[in-house]
Structure formats: C-alpha cells, structure tokens
Amino acid sequence: EVYGSIESGSFREEDNLLPSSPYSASKCGGDRLAYSYFKTYDLPVIITRASNNFGAFQYPEKLIPLFVTNAIDNLKLPVYGNGLNVRDWLYVDDHCDAINFLIKKGKLGEVYNIGGNNEFSNLDITYRILDQLNKSRKLIEFVDDRKGHDLRYSLDCSKIHELGWSPKNSFDNALKKSIQWYFQNKSWWGPIKSGDFKKYYKNQYKI
C-alpha cells in the first residue's frame, strides 16, 4: 500500500512511496521512521514491504477471513465496487519464513519487497472461497467502493529472490488450509464477530 496503485508492471524497492489513504500513509510513516533510526542511531533495521497476507487467526475484518466466515454462516459477501481491484496474496507462513530469512541474510538498512506472486481480483478470490465451500454465488452483494481504494498492487520481489528466498506454498493449497482452519475454529472467530464488530460491519458496508 505504501507505493500506491500501479496499472501495469510491479513496484520495485527504489520506487517512490505514494500512499493513497491515511491508513497507507501511516504505514509509510512507520517505514521511514524505522529507516531514520537506522541512519541516525545505527539501529539494526531491515524494512520489509509485503503484499496482502492471509491465513489462520487473521482478524475477520480482512477480506479472506470475512468472506470465509460469512459464507460459512450463509451471510452476504460484501464486494467493494465492481470487485476488480487486484491484490497479490501472500500466505502468512511464507511471510514469517521470509522475515526469518532476512534476519539471517538481509542487509541492514535495506528494503525488501515480499510477495506471493498470486495476483487475483477481489471477485476472483470471492469465487474461489464460495466454490471451495460449495456455496452459491448469490451470496455476493456489491457495495459502494471505499474511499482511497487502490485498483492494483503488485510487487517486484527480485531482490529477495536473488538472496535465495521464495514462497513455499501454492495459493490454492494455502487458501484451502485457511478455509479449513476457519471452518474448524468458529469458537475463535464467532465471538469476535459479535457485539462491536456488528456495529463496525453495518457502518462499513451499509448492509
């Protein structure tokens, strides 16, 4: 998100940071603050910029856990705009593995993109979730797009690949494992989606 949106190609670490929303700007600020401590105080810092994560224990406001848990409960899946916003998806286990790899082999003060090379539109992700759960696509409900919603994120991860890291999990297998986890752990996410979460959900999606 710190790079902003890109129509074609992929962002490299040296590209300008052009966040489109206060949320992404806060990430950009944290990125640069960490670097400033490296430059000023020689604090051992390595900066990583990762694509969209997914996996077990992800808070259910995020797209994949929200849509999986809604589908399990036969609730509507609120898709922003036309659903064609594209994201690159990175399984959380691979993200953790990449961070551990960079702690050992990364260069202090450097920036590394971490992506899964799994670019899909939000609508594609929605279809995959519904298909894996054998749920009807009639559960999809298109809602007004959110403000500052970037169209496409894409990362060039050549830098970390050249060091020797690449993701181990295929997207389809990782999504299957994630869906299975949420299916088996309603005792964790069920209470989270009650109470204040319902108020947030209604205000966010107007459904």
Task: Place the predicted regions along the sequence by residue.
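Catalytic helix-loop patch of NAD(P)-dependent Rossmann-fold dehydrogenases
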Residues: 1-47, 52-54, 58-60
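C-terminal substrate-binding subdomain of Rossmann-fold SDR/epimerase-dehydratase oxidoreductases
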Residues: 65, 71-207
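Hydrophobic alpha-helix immediately C-terminal to the catalytic Tyr-X-X-X-Lys motif of short-chain
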Residues: 29, 33, 37, 67, ...
